[in-house]
Amino acid sequence: FMLSLYPLVSSVTNISIQKFARSVAPVQAIGFGTRSSLAALPATYAAADTLDIPEKISGIVLPIAVTLFKFASPLARTTGTYFIAHLYGIDLTPTELIIIAIAIGLLSFYSPGIPSGGLLIMTPVYVSLGLPVEGIGILIAIDLVVDMFLTMANVTANVASSALIAKIQ
């Protein structure tokens, strides 16, 4: 999922895949280790600077992206919801899964950039679907590992969005 950003950035911005990968690697390492997009923000600025993204763009785009743009959340949280529903013997239709993904995508704008912040938005989704809220406790138990990869994808998407907006501007 995250790897789709590399060719996208390369084809739209003329930044080589290697340069993009080298620039975002420190940001990914910090995101992976801290599980916080916010903690990775200084390194994200450094990556944007390495990619020659103008400071007037990165200075606006990156803080907004860290706060609002959760690239990996809808897919991962929908998968977690499907897992919990299956665990409790509840069948979800494809339509319900799409509704879940849309709801999580919209609610992810409100999730904080802190470790496991995306789980905070799950309760309203579970309640509205009649899923057992206790299932979120199971997700919390395994979220340590999952959140590392989600944060890595999110911080990569933050740099990518900054590069794409710089190209448009």
Regions found by a protein language model. Give the residues of each.
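Entry/N-cap segments of selected transmembrane alpha helices
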Residues: 1-6
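Transmembrane helical segments that form the transport core of multi-pass membrane transport proteins
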Residues: 8, 13-17
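Select transmembrane alpha-helical segments in multipass membrane proteins
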Residues: 24-25, 140
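Helix-loop-helix junctions within the multi-pass membrane cores of secondary transporters/permeases
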Residues: 26-108, 158, 162
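Transmembrane alpha-helical segments and their short flanking loops
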Residues: 78-169
